[in-house]
């Protein structure tokens, strides 16, 4: 549900014309759309949608035509199956879509007591309604006493009559917990308190009166200049990096969910609407399909995703900011979903050729369909497009913890290959790693231990870090028995091969690394020994799957084998090769 909307939803809907754009746009598959800023939950895409890619026309062009907008995006019409699933989630209809009588057995046994204060009426006086959605509405209000006396606030009102399933109740409980835990970041809407009575839950927050980011885009003629777009992206990335470090994924990032505090040009941007947010541990994946159709990541449609899904949404926002069009468009939801899965964003038409190469690269590295190759929020803040336009203050990045864990458990053969690759990194790439190394608090001698990882996270931990079980994951790393790392080995352990592979310079990196490996670490190795090094079991036909890893001329690791070794291997991946 939207928070602090600048104008009522009814007024917005009048400004949402039916698009008359042609239907030849690429299509894509399955995520839920939000009408007027509210969630729809979609089931997995029908297999029949993917027999052939509708993104490829007879001219074999697989890119999305430019879609310039001068008015707010027309929301896609919700498909019947999405409506049905959403209704079932909140208990408004049975699976066969028959109405559930008021007070039916579906609500028997549901505990709708949240433990919030019941003194809302004595603390706040409700003013006008500023937004309405499927499961509640948002009002402005004024504090009557206490620290907020006389202050304007926003109140999100969620009727308990809408909470007819345990899932719906848990969604509200989790939203309040996340807001309470994360409040305080300068780019996140300030949470004040939560109340309840017999009829409603009231979430009291900062009232943002500067309007939506979407409105600002439209006021500027549909797009931002590069300079102004950078300012917006830095604020978005800053708050998202903070959320991800705490183990929180927003799951509905879009221009409508970022508000300016005031109408002043220098007003800070605030992330709002955590109604779809959830906790996710670094080594776990979510599988429920939520979000808004234009901004949904491909892996969400495939029902296996993590914080990388937010980065895709940020990529869509960046694309819109810079060119004034959506990267994926179609007349229907299913068409949008097919475009997300199959089509490529258009970077050929104006204004892309006139934008800086760094700006184009920034967006491309966020809109990579392979989530493993996507930048994290902390990495994006270190991208050359943004470096220099803000004071470099990079937060800790959870991907470092994941990569180091894999590195420690890797074979000595792979570690030596990664060491060679680390020596090919450029200064901008090393800047990010140096920041992450410093955040871990190295000793005076320049070393970090596994305990440093836990200590660093604890410095910035919140209740959300505990609820997401991020601390459990970090504790696993801190308990690993491994020698101390200097910066050189840290770089080898913390670099992402997949992210390097997404760069245009990947081939040069790989070739140069192989040359270094040839000089320092390559040696004659038997297939059986290689299989042992890789930890492959007896069930793997090693002579079949590893034969092209070794050069027949001298028995040493081939370039192909070297690259595969960099990516890491398992019995499963080898058998698929």
Swiss-Prot record:
One GO term of the cellular component aspect? membrane
Q: What are the record keywords, sorted?
A: ATP-binding, Calcium, Kinase, Lipoprotein, Membrane, Metal-binding, Myristate, Nucleotide-binding, Phosphoprotein, Repeat, Serine/threonine-protein kinase, Transferase
Output the Gene Ontology terms for molecular function. Answer: ATP binding; metal ion binding; protein serine kinase activity; protein serine/threonine kinase activity
Domain EF-hand as annotated: residue spans: 428-464, 465-500, 501-540, 543-572
> A Pfam family for this UniProt protein?
Pkinase
Q: Which CDD domains does this one have? A: STKc_CAMK (cd05117)
* Gene this protein is translated from: CRK7
The reaction(s) catalysed by this protein are:
L-seryl-[protein] + ATP = O-phospho-L-seryl-[protein] + ADP + H(+); L-threonyl-[protein] + ATP = O-phospho-L-threonyl-[protein] + ADP + H(+)
Query: What task does this protein carry out?
Result: May play a role in signal transduction pathways that involve calcium as a second messenger.
Q: What is its EC number?
A: 2.7.11.1
Q: What is known of its domains?
A: There are 3 contiguous domains conserved in the CDPK subfamily: a kinase domain, an autoinhibitory (junction) domain and a calmodulin-like domain. The autoinhibitory domain (391-421) inactivates kinase activity under calcium-free conditions.
Name-wise, this protein is CDPK-related kinase 7
Q: Where is this region: Disordered?
A: 1-38
Q: Which residues form the active site?
A: 252
UniProt xrefs under SMART domains? S_TKc
């Amino acid at each position: 549900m939207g928070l602090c909307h600048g104008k009522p939803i009814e007024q917005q809907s009048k400004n949402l014309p039916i698009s008359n754009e042609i239907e030849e746009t690429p299509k894509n598959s399955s995520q839920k759309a939000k009408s007027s800023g509210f969630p729809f939950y979609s089931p997995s895409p029908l297999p029949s949608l993917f027999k052939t890619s509708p993104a490829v026309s007879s001219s074999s062009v697989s890119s999305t035509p430019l879609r310039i907008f001068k008015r707010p995006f027309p929301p896609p019409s919700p498909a019947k199956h999405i409506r049905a699933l959403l209704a079932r989630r909140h208990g408004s209809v049975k699976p066969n879509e028959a109405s559930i009588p008021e007070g039916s057995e579906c609500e028997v046994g549901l505990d709708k007591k949240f433990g919030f204060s019941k003194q809302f009426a004595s603390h706040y006086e409700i003013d006008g309604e500023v937004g309405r959605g499927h499961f509640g509405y948002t009002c402005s209000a004024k504090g009557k006493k206490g620290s907020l006396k006389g202050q304007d606030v926003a109140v999100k009102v969620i009727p308990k009559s809408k909470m007819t399933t345990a899932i719906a109740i848990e969604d509200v409980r989790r939203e309040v917990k996340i807001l309470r835990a994360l409040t305080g970041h300068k780019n996140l809407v300030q949470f004040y308190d939560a109340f309840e009575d017999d009829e409603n839950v009231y979430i009291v927050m900062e009232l943002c009166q500067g309007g939506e980011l979407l409105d600002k885009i439209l006021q500027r003629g549909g797009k931002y200049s590069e300079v102004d777009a950078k300012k917006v992206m830095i604020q978005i990335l800053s708050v998202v990096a903070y959320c991800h470090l705490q183990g929180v994924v927003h799951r509905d990032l879009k221009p409508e969910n970022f508000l300016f505090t005031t109408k002043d040009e220098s007003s800070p941007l605030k992330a709002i609407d955590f109604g779809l947010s959830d906790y996710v541990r670094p080594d776990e994946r979510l599988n429920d399909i939520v979000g808004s159709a234009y901004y949904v990541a491909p892996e969400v449609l495939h029902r296996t995703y993590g914080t990388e899904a937010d980065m895709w949404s940020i990529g869509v926002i960046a694309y819109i900011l810079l060119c004034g069009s959506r990267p994926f468009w179609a007349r229907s939801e299913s068409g949008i979903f097919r475009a997300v899965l199959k089509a490529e964003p258009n970077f050929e038409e104006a204004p892309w050729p006139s934008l800086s190469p760094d700006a184009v690269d920034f967006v491309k590295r966020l809109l990579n369909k392979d989530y493993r190759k996507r930048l994290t929020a902390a990495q994006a803040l270190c991208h050359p497009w943004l470096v220099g336009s803000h004071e470099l203050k990079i937060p800790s990045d959870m991907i470092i913890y994941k990569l180091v864990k894999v590195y420690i458990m890797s074979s000595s053969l792979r570690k030596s290959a990664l060491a060679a690759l680390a020596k090919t990194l450029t200064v901008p790439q090393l800047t990010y790693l140096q920041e992450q190394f410093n955040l871990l608090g190295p000793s005076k001698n320049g070393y970090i231990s596994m305990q440093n990882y836990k200590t660093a996270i604890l410095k910035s931990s919140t209740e959300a870090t505990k609820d997401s079980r991020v601390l459990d994951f970090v504790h696993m790393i801190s308990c690993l028995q491994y020698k101390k790392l200097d910066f050189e080995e840290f770089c080898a352990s913390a670099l992402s091969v997949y992210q390097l592979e997404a760069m245009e310079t990947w081939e040069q990196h790989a070739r140069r690394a192989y040359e270094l490996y040839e000089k320092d670490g390559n040696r004659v190795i038997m297939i059986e020994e290689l299989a042992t090094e890789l930890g492959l079991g007896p069930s793997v036909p090693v002579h079949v799957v590893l034969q092209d890893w070794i050069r027949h001329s001298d028995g040493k690791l081939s370039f192909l084998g070297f690259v595969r070794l960099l990516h890491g291997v398992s019995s499963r991946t080898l058998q698929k090769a």
